[in-house]
Amino acid sequence: MSNEIDVNGPIGIFDSGFGGLTVARAVIDLLPNEDIVYIGDTGRYPYGDKDPNDVREYARELAWSLVRDYKAKAIVVACNTAAAALPVHELEAELAADGLHIPVIGVIDPGAQSLVRATRS
């Protein structure tokens, strides 16, 4: 696989099921000219009752599928359980270690940052 990032590639989004579709809808609303690929891992849903190490592997598999199979230029982890088991900065570092400098965005950090801002005012 080439380590070149296709700037015309889609934004890849994954979740353990269908809940991340609300995140996908928000991305579409904010970036209407971008292509989106969504993977809902319904075969292993729900993640909440799974061993965290298994969830880490699921997240890795889904991220690599988005990069390898769909040539995603960015990844959104729309699953709180996956982002807690494999923090987005770790996933981003793993991709970068293979020469893939792809932004990985989660949903936990933005929510926590919003809470911090709201409680400091």
Predicted feature locations:
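Non-catalytic structural scaffold of enzyme domains
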Residues: S2-S121
